[in-house]
Amino acid sequence: QMFQAVEIDGKAYWDGGFSGNPTISPLVRECSANDTILVQINPVKRRRTPTTASAIASRVNEISFNAPLLKELQMIALLQQVADLGHCEGQLWARMRMHRIESDYLNELDYASKMNAEWAALTALRDEGIKAADTFLAEKGHHLGKRASLDLSALLEGM
């Protein structure tokens, strides 16, 4: 598949999955908030191994889009393990608390659903996003401002 860049004010922008989504590091270095909430739309793992050509192509797409993010999360996990709390940069990484909003609904969608711009599909995504955020807040919201609710080591285990 091939998509053209979107031009805004004379500058070309590519889909993040092809060039890397915005990095997390500026949130550590340039933001006073210690909590970062990752809204994950592509599953890291699947319950079932894809067997059809379309399911395999969809999974390849998910892996490709997740690769830059997973690499950065791996770097963050490593930096947090070795951070020198006496060093300014080390303190920034050590204080970072990662959280993740995810949805089983999104895990059931295939690649073709990403091309669906019909109003019903968009409102279903919005509604599922609200539901996922509400679930996150009910189950893990009490961690905000206190501790990470996303275990980076467990997420990256076996990657």
PLM features per residue range, with description:
Residues 1-159:
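Patatin-like phospholipase
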